[in-house]
UniProtKB/Swiss-Prot annotation:
PANTHER family tied to this protein: METAL DEPENDENT HYDROLASE - RELATED, MYG1 EXONUCLEASE
Further facts: Present with 6080 molecules/cell in log phase SD medium.
Gene Ontology CC: chromatin; cytoplasm; nucleus
Annotated protein name in UniProt: MYG1 protein YER156C
Biological process annotations from GO: positive regulation of cellular respiration
InterPro entries reported in the protein's UniProt record: MYG1_exonuclease (IPR003226)
Family to which this protein belongs: Belongs to the MYG1 family.
Organism: Saccharomyces cerevisiae (strain ATCC 204508 / S288c)
Length: 338
């Protein structure tokens, strides 16, 4: 399906959500929670069943029913299902992705109390899917994060299944040697849905109330960069904020990609930091590092060797440094550009 359809619901009627019984996973745990954030499903009854009679009596089915129509049925297990979030994505959707695709904008607006503009809503809609929901889709559909050749002998250095959200949700199912009645599974599912839903709401609020407002600060710093240094390679933020993704996006918008190399900002103690700009938002490789001879030095030794008073540290890897004043971190950045 190419278009995103929404079912028109009669809010005066009591709604019923249905998902499958038995063992549960992260995707339907989140899908059910997201639906219940919406006014039309806030007080909906939840039925966990594989009985077609229960499906027929329900208003919406997630992760069960063997079909997807974007109105009542939101399953992804059937043959021939290859739906993705949009044409930019290749990951096949799970029930979490399907519900978010159709209801995500309304879900975000509900979490943020409708305090979001149309353009910002579109940005958050993509951001939340990319940073959170897509990974659940991939996990449930058995899609690896990496494309690894079949003949590869790569082995992980450690196991992280138990600390991943899908792993935690899986562990919330009843143990095999405990009560495994439908009632027990339903109680455990309710706890799992609340757990992953809480993580999701915290994430959306963080993006809407912290990450998104930071864009204006980064944009202003970029616009004023020539007042900081004539090279245009250093920007100053009035305080720390999530800046990396905004920096890359704004560079593209302003056609100045890869030109900014250092970001100055205050930390929580009131001291100043100079950060290199990574080649991407998750990399420790940087466009330009702090001076090699100063890496790993601290305090007086660093101040003496650099000739810059008030230095605190430069990380041994050269990606960040600290000092007591804006002037000091500016000088460290300038030394790196020389």
């Amino acid at each position: 399906m190419n278009s995103v359809k929404r079912v028109k619901l009669n809010s005066k009627m009591s709604k019923q959500i249905c998902t499958h019984s038995g063992s549960f996973h992260a995707d339907e745990s989140l899908a059910v929670y997201m639906l219940r954030l919406l006014p039309e499903f806030k007080d909906a009854k939840l039925v966990r069943s594989r009985n077609p009679k229960d499906w027929e009596a329900s208003d919406i089915l997630v992760d069960v029913g063997a079909q997807y129509d974007g109105v009542k049925f939101f399953d992804h297990h059937q043959r021939g299902f290859f739906e993705t979030f949009n044409e930019k994505y290749k990951t096949k959707l799970s029930s979490a992705g399907l519900i978010f695709k159709h209801y995500g904008r309304d879900i975000i607006k509900t979490i943020l109390n409708n305090k979001v503009s149309s353009s910002d809503l579109d940005l958050l809609y993509d951001k939340v899917y990319k940073q959170f929901v897509e990974a659940l889709d991939a996990n449930d559909n058995g899609i690896s994060k990496y494309t690894i050749p079949k003949d590869s002998n790569l082995e992980p250095n450690f196991r992280d299944n138990a600390i991943s959200i899908p792993g935690i949700i899986s562990g919330m199912n009843p143990n095999w040697n405990e009560d495994t009645s439908d009632e027990s599974f339903d109680r455990c599912f309710a706890r799992a849905s609340e757990f992953i839903g809480g993580v999701f709401v915290t994430l959306v609020r963080g993006y809407g109330q912290s990450w998104l407002p930071a864009k204006a600060l980064v944009a202003q710093a970029i616009d004023e960069r020539m007042d900081v240094d004539k090279s245009g390679k250093i920007i100053v933020l009035p305080q720390f904020c999530p800046w990396k993704e905004h920096l890359y996006e704004l560079e593209r918008e302003k056609n100045i990609e890869k030109q900014i190399e250092f970001v100055l900002f205050t930390d929580s103690s009131g001291a100043w930091r100079v950060s290199t700009v990574p080649i991407n938002s998750t990399s420790f490789q940087f466009r330009r590092g702090l001076p090699e001879p100063l890496r790993g030095l601290r305090d007086e030794e660093l101040s003496t060797k650099s000739g810059v008073p008030g230095c605190i540290f430069i990380h041994a890897a050269g990606f960040i440094g600290g000092a007591k004043s804006k002037e000091a971190v500016y000088e460290l950045a300038k030394m790196s550009l020389a």
